[in-house]
């Protein structure tokens, strides 16, 4: 009897130890993963990604997104179709400035440095542009749009600089390409979660213009990163020769069918996914037949949706990063189209007929949709890093992402045009359900172009050696490491 009681106690102790071990693995697993990346890629790369992708882009963009929505709706009083079209204009900076500064960071060092000055420049431009919006009263719509486009350009400059680091490391450590994109996306998603969570509260407390003023701190951080950035000084460079070599490498690469075909697919899949989110935003907040959400509620719902982004990153990193590109694009596109049915059910108010309140239904919709969108982005990012040759990583990755952003701009413009044709306005939403239905059907069309996507899996796919330019890689000029804070203080 005593032995049986002892066995029961031992089994109970084993279960307790197992639970503690599982809890420890949940907590320590991400820490070990970060340590692994820091040891193989240098801790400074991890710090750079968290600062730029997490704080400036994730937190800053999500906070600014909600502030811009209310600024356009309440301060500038624009129609949803007009706002949808105007939002496409701000994307122009990502199409023009990202490839432009991508090639400049590769071939034109400033004061002998390839990366530091561009981080500093991006931060200064972002701070100045947001200060103009936040401090000017009665700012004309198109002048406000101009400064928003400039701030978007500043974010694009910072983004292309960190992209160059990621792409270089992906070429140097191809087995870690998926992990690096997971780090970027996870940082962004966590920052996005915090930004959306605080957005509604801050807009309510200080107004949309006040939020623009607060966002200057995230751009100031970008300049700080530029000050701390350490890289070898370049001496005796030839801009003309570097530019000529970069153009030749780009032309040689873009002619490769393994490059232009997936690039075309990425543009098609973005352009055909009509963007009507501004029309839905007006319906959420202004329509008498809609939920009539307050500012705090909108921010909270968007923050809950960001949990879906984090789940998407975790799902990709744990289960999907070894699957073939074509298979992943197929399933993510199918799920992307199906997730749009949540919006259709909501606009038609079918959820109320099934006893599902708007709040609960939109939360579920946000989590599922964000998870699928993040999965799609992850696959696109990993594929883009695989398509970049050595020596012009920043240039070519920026070119590929500008193609992707051109697709998003086309999607936003076509979505605004559709809202205008269907007469969806600030007060009339009768045809919004039809716009949602058309958008969902259009999301299925890119599946017809899947033959453009390479069949290889994400770990083994690689461009030919003559395209990658592996023989001409210069490791000495690509040592992209951040100086430690201690070293910086010592130099000061």
From Swiss-Prot:
Stored SUPFAM superfamilies: MFS general substrate transporter
Transmembrane segments: 46-66, 92-112, 117-137, 142-162, 186-206, 210-230, 264-285, 298-318, 328-348, 361-381, 396-416, 433-453
GO cellular component: membrane; plastid
Membrane topology: Multi-pass membrane protein
Alphabetically ordered keywords of this record: Membrane, Transmembrane, Transmembrane helix, Transport
Location of the protein in the cell: Membrane
Lineage: superkingdom: Eukaryota
Function description: Could mediate folate transport.
Protein family membership: Belongs to the major facilitator superfamily. Folate-biopterin transporter (TC 2.A.71) family.
Name by which UniProt lists this protein: Probable folate-biopterin transporter 5
Source organism phylogeny: Eukaryota, Viridiplantae, Streptophyta, Embryophyta, Tracheophyta
């Amino acid at each position: 009897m005593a032995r049986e009681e002892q066995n029961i106690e031992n089994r109970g102790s084993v279960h307790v130890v197992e639970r503690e071990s599982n809890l420890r693995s949940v907590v320590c697993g991400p820490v070990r993963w970060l340590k692994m990346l820091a040891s193989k890629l240098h801790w400074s790369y991890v710090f750079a990604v968290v600062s730029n992708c997490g704080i400036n882009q994730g937190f800053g963009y999500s906070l600014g997104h909600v502030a811009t929505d209310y600024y356009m709706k309440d301060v500038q009083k624009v129609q949803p179709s007009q706002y949808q079209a105007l939002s496409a204009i701000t994307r122009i900076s990502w199409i023009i400035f990202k490839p432009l500064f991508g090639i400049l960071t590769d071939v034109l060092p400033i004061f002998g440095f390839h990366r530091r000055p561009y981080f500093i420049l991006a931060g200064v431009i972002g701070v100045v542009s947001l200060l103009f919006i936040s401090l000017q009263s009665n700012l004309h719509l198109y002048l406000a749009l101009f400064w928003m486009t400039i701030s978007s350009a500043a974010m694009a400059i910072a983004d292309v600089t960190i992209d160059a680091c990621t792409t270089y490391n992906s070429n140097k450590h191809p087995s870690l390409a998926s992990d690096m994109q997971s780090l970027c996306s996870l940082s962004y998603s966590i920052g996005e979660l915090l930004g959306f969570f605080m957005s509604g509260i801050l807009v309510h407390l200080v107004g949309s213009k006040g939020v623009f003023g607060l966002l200057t701190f995230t751009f100031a951080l970008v300049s700080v990163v530029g000050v701390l950035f350490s890289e070898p000084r370049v001496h005796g460079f030839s801009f003309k020769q570097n530019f000529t070599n970069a153009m030749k490498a780009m032309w040689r690469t873009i002619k490769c069918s393994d490059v232009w075909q997936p690039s075309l697919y990425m543009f098609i899949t973005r352009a055909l996914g009509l963007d009507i989110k501004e029309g839905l935003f007006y319906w959420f907040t202004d329509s008498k037949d809609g939920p009539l959400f307050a500012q705090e509620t909108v921010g909270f719902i968007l923050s809950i949706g960001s949990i879906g982004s984090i789940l998407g990153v975790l799902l990709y990193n744990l289960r999907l990063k070894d699957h073939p590109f074509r298979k992943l694009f197929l399933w993510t596109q199918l799920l992307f189209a199906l997730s749009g049915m949540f919006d259709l059910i909501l606009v038609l108010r079918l959820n109320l007929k099934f006893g599902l309140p708007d709040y609960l239904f939109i939360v579920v919709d946000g989590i599922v949709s964000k998870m699928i969108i993040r999965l799609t982005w992850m696959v696109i990012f990993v594929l883009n890093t695989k398509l970049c040759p050595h020596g012009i990583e920043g240039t070519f990755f920026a070119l590929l992402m500008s193609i992707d952003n051109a697709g998003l701009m086309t999607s936003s413009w076509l979505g605004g045009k559709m809202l205008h044709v269907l007469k969806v306005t600030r007060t009339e939403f009768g045809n919004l359900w039809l716009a949602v239905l058309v958008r969902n059907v259009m999301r299925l069309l890119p599946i017809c172009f899947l033959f453009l996507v390479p069949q290889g899996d994400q770990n083994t796919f690689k461009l030919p050696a003559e395209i990658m330019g592996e023989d001409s890689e210069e490791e000495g000029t690509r040592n992209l490491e951040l100086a430690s804070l201690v070293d910086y203080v010592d130099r000061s």
